[in-house]
């Protein structure tokens, strides 16, 4: 959430910056609500002061032996008016808060301006796509050839956009997740966490999925308790570890990593990537989250992105790194890098990781703070999140890039210890 004071004092500039994201801030609505808020607040404060004065007069009149009944009635009426004013003020403030909750973050000045993914800027490439001397197969054909990948049974169980993995491919999927977790904890300094897969609404509001993107979530309604949501990413549960906390500066940075399933309705993806494992309702992801001091968040973003890149490099998968433009960034991000891995059957790069600096946007929603050692006062932390990596899409990339003419798959060198030394599957 943006700082309400910043929005009030720099409304025009904020609206212009948000316009580069394709977001039209309702300036007139904000100004009208802000005007109402000020008017009601002034009226309420004046009424409170007047009531306090009248209350003092009651004691003085009583001491003089005067009839205080009229004064008591007047003070009672003022009390009723004051309560009504406070309710009106709360209603206006709730509208303002709801307006602010639906406003995306401001892009950093270093973010390229663009309307959509066509405006993204390629920063770097690593590796060279392999040249095949045989007709390549996509991951679906490779998986189904050996009976490892079963979409028909998955559809019988759960409907479209689910996959059933069996045998060596299921083991390879597990190997990838274990390799990623071990790399991030062993070499990159992250603390592994096992988190709930079901969270309440405030957690999703804290990281920015609610209220704006509820249609993308799977919701579990409960009659006698708060509704629960399946996490769309471990970013939600990991980042909310610090919700409502005031951290000691010595605790920072906090670096968490978790391997979890992720659940997304893909409400806006009708007709896209309907074949295979690229876009699923349920998929596994290894997620990195960092909680840092404000001055260190952009440095942390570069480091986190490098951690995700290291996974691809060790797997020897060609990829490219993109700086997302203003119109393609996620709701909560100040700046984002995407990593796209080479998918031979599609003859193009596909997203496999997104690493974002969210600044104090999520922290303000969560009230996550640290005590600044220089001032002794609580200040908002900065939060970052990144995929390290999406396990299913990494599996797709390994299957297709490591395929052989007979449909068998070479096991990447770094995965052999997790595969019992097996060099080829199929």
UniProtKB/Swiss-Prot annotation:
GO terms for cellular component: cytoplasm. It catalyses: tRNA(Ser) + L-serine + ATP = L-seryl-tRNA(Ser) + AMP + diphosphate + H(+); tRNA(Sec) + L-serine + ATP = L-seryl-tRNA(Sec) + AMP + diphosphate + H(+). One of its GO terms (molecular function) is ATP binding. ATP binds at residues 264-266, 351-354. It is found in: Cytoplasm. Belongs to the class-II aminoacyl-tRNA synthetase family. Type-1 seryl-tRNA synthetase subfamily. Catalyzes the attachment of serine to tRNA(Ser). Is also able to aminoacylate tRNA(Sec) with serine, to form the misacylated tRNA L-seryl-tRNA(Sec), which will be further converted into selenocysteinyl-tRNA(Sec). This is Serine--tRNA ligase. The lineage of its organism: Bacteria, Pseudomonadati, Pseudomonadota, Gammaproteobacteria, Pseudomonadales. The gene is serS.
């Amino acid at each position: 959430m943006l700082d309400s004071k910043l929005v009030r004092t720099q409304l025009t500039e904020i609206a212009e910056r948000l316009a580069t994201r394709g977001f039209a801030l309702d300036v007139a609505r904000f100004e009208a609500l802000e005007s109402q808020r000020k008017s009601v607040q002034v009226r309420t404060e004046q009424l409170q002061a007047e009531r306090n004065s009248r209350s003092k007069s009651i004691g003085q009149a009583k001491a003089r032996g005067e009839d205080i009944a009229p004064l008591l009635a007047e003070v009672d009426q003022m009390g009723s008016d004051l309560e009504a004013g406070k309710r009106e003020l709360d209603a206006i403030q709730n509208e303002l808060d709801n307006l602010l909750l639906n406003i995306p973050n401001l892009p950093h000045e270093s973010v390229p301006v663009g309307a959509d993914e066509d405006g993204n800027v390629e920063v770097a490439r690593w590796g060279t796509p392999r040249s095949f001397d045989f007709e390549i197969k996509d991951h679906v054909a490779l998986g189904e050839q050996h009976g490892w990948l079963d979409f028909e049974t998955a559809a019988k169980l759960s409907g479209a956009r689910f996959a059933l993995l069996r045998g060596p491919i299921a083991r390879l999927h597990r190997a990838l997740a274990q390799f990623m977790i071990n790399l991030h904890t062993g070499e990159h300094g992250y603390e592994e966490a096992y988190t709930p897969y079901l969270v309440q609404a405030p957690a999703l509001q804290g990281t920015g999925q609610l209220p704006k993107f509820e249609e993308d979530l799977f919701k579990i309604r409960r009659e006698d308790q708060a509704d629960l949501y399946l996490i769309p990413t471990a970013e939600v549960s990991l980042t909310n570890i610090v919700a409502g906390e005031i951290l000691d500066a010595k605790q920072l940075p906090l670096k968490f990593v978790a391997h979890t399933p992720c659940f997304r309705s893909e409400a806006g993806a009708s007709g896209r990537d309907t074949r295979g494992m690229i876009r699923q309702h349920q998929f596994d992801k290894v997620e990195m989250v960092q909680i840092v001091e404000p001055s260190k968040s952009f440095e942390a973003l570069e480091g986190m992105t490098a951690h995700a890149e290291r996974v691809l490099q060790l797997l020897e998968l060609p990829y490219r790194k993109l700086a997302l433009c203003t119109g393609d960034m996620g709701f909560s991000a100040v700046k984002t890098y995407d990593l796209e891995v080479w998918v031979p059957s599609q003859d193009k790069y596909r997203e496999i990781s997104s690493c974002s600096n969210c600044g104090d946007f999520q922290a303000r929603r969560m009230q996550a703070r640290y005590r600044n050692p220089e001032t002794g006062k609580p200040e908002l932390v900065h939060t970052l999140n990144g995929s390290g990596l999406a396990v299913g899409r990494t599996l797709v990339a390994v299957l297709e890039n490591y395929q052989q003419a007979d449909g068998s798959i070479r096991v990447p060198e770094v995965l052999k210890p997790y595969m019992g030394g097996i060099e080829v599957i199929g």
